[in-house]
Structure formats: C-alpha cells, structure tokens
Amino acid sequence: MKKLLTSILSLGVVCSAALAAEPVITAVKVSESLDAVKADSAVWSKAKFETVTLYPQTAIEFNDKKANELTAKVKAKKAQVAALHDGKNIAVLVKWADKTKDVEQCMSSDVYTDGFAVQFAGATKKAEPLPYIGMGSSGRPVVVHLQKATAKVYEPNGNKDVAHQINRQQTGVFGKELADFDAKVAALADTDYERVFVGEGFRSLTEIKDGSVKSNSAMAHGPAGWSGSLVRPLKDEYVNLNGTVPVSIAVWDGSNMGRNGLKNLSSWVAINLEGQKANAAMVAELSTDAKGNAAKGKEAAMTNGCNGCHQLEATDAKSFMGPALHNVGGYSTAAYLRESILKPSAVVVPGYNRNAHANTPWYNIEKGKRVSTMTDFSFLDKATVEDIVAYLKTLKAEVE
C-alpha cells in the first residue's frame, strides 16, 4: 500500500510538471495606427486572446507582517492577454478579475492601489539567455512599463507654485474666486500614473525621464475587473522587438496591500509578431514543458540539501538563507532555474537583512560584486539537473 501511495504521489508531481508551459501569443498585424489605442478601442476585436497565469511573488518577503499574511493566502490569477502590432508599435491588452477598485488617493500612507506592468527584455547582442524575471540581471536589461490606478495625484513639479498648495479654507476667497482656485488646483493634478523603468537587476531599477521612450498605457475597471492597455514602439534606445517578443505581466491588488514586490507575476511569455520570422528556440523554451522527472527531481533536491537553505513547499518552515521557492515554478523559466543550479551567482536574489541574521549570510562581496553563498552544483549530471528543474517547475500556488 505504501508503495502504491508513493507511486500515486510521484505521478501527481509529474502531471503537475506537464502544466508548466505558457501559451504563445500572436500579435496580429493591423493596418490601423496603434499610437492612441486604449482598452476599449475597436481594433482589439481583431486580437487573439490567450490565458496567462500570474503567480504570487513570494521569493522576497516584506518587513510587513500583515502584508505577508495576506500574501500567503493569495492564489494565482488567470489573465487574458492579447497583442497587436502595426509594424512600428506593439500594443498589449491585459484583462484580469478584481472585484474591488483600489485607487491611489494620496490621502493616506497605508492605502494601496491596483496596477499592472508589462516587462520587455532589453536589446542585447544575443536574445538568450533572457533576463531574470525580477527587474533583469547584469548584462541582461529589462524595460518595465508601470501603470497605477489613480484619481488625483499631486507631485512636486518644480514650478515653485506655493499659492495653489494650501488648503482651500485658508485662501480667504469665496464664491467665484474660490471656484477659480479649485479649478486651478484640479488642473495641476496628475490623473495618469504611468512610469517607465530600465533595470539590470536588483537595486538598479531607474525611471526613464528624458522622454526617450514614447509609450501610452491606461487602466479601466468594470464589473469583471480591470483592463490594462499599453502601446509602445517596437524599437527605441532600449529595445529592439522583432520576430518573437518575450514579455512578463504583473498585477497588483491594493486590497491585499500590494505594492513593489507584493504582486502576481507571470513567467516570460512569447509574443510572435505576425508577418515576421519567429525565434523558434525562444518559443520552444517558453512554451515547452520541463523534460525531467519531477519525482526524481524532488528526491535529488532533498539529497543535495536544497531544503536546507530554501523553503521549497508552502508548508515547509521558512528559511533565513535563500529565497523562498514555493512559487518559483510559476514565474520562472526552465532556463533560469537551470542557470541558478549551475551558476548560482548569475542572479543573486535579495534575502533577509544580513545584520539581523548574521548566521545565514546569503552572499559575500568579491571584487565589488555579490557572490552567492549557494553551492555550485555544476558537478551534477545533466539528467539530475533536468529532474530538479522539472520538480521546481511544479512549485506554484493554486489558481483561483
């Protein structure tokens, strides 16, 4: 009976691995200009939607007990994603369920907003390996387009206009003069929180403020949830999108105190530009199931002590050494997992405060660079590595 139960459990792990692949999205080529496309634009009727799953990001834990408790209960979300291109621009539309509309009001520091982001791999000499899913990696940049749901946001504008920064009850004017004052204040408000960033790894994310990226994104909420749209050029100073475009989608839920790393995130997803030659190798990498034996991989992970530094299963005790991996299979490619096993210093994911947990240092500084304290497992045979990758790909949250 014990042998039968073990076989059933092993089969379950193997079957889970078969669900690892992401769909391939076709960016339909249209004759219409996409410069001003929005979520409700008629041109989207030509698009082909695919289901992309977004998993809770749990590799990095916040210094926020309540937020962490909420994140622990978050399930994976299904989003409907479509893309279009007109030969000059690419447009992406993301639809996801969210019953609550959480909007930035700038009236409280503990109110959080809904939002979404689309991440593109930056221009490099070689398309692969892809950047790390979390803000890129050294030599492998990413461009991130972030859109938040906002009402009226007031930010420093450098105009030295103090007169319109005071409370309306302190103006000393009434009637039409007060109405004029209110109108001028309203005109200063920013109702579109759209930002673009470039990054090559943790601590490097930098906002692009010089106008070198021309993009337009927006959000709209309805009974079914949010729709977020983005349009940007296929080519500029930071990206050269052609053939197959790898993208990653993230969404934030303000009701769950979502912000920064507290989000749901997809793995890299391939978008093929209709009418252009696809990158077959990249498509295969992003849409093909892990080839290893997940059951053997779990055994190998335990044998090689992976659970000594990482929280592998959601029910395992937390580790203060390496990042938690109980959702890593949802938002990581097989190539990234393989690289992390063989070259652990290629991407050093932030861990806990080393001063607070001096007995569990997760990196050392060598020649000015962070070097992971993780063992280099390049001594493992190829089959074992592929088995561990297949097992790690099964580690993901339940889909709501």
Spans of features found by a protein language model:
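Surface-exposed, glycine/proline- and aromatic-rich loop segments on solvent-exposed faces
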Residues: E22-V24, S33, T51, P56-V185, ...
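Gram-negative bacterial Sec-dependent N-terminal signal peptides
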Residues: M1-L19
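Short, well-ordered beta-strand segments enriched in hydrophobic/aromatic residues
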Residues: V37, N89-W96, W226-R232
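Long, compositionally biased interface segments
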Residues: A218-S287
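Electrostatic cytochrome c docking/interface patches
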Residues: A278-M302
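Periplasmic/extracellular electron-transfer cofactor-ligation site
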Residues: G292, K298-N327, Y331, K343-G368, ...
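Long, low-complexity, polar/charged, intrinsically disordered or flexibly structured peripheral segments
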Residues: P156-H221
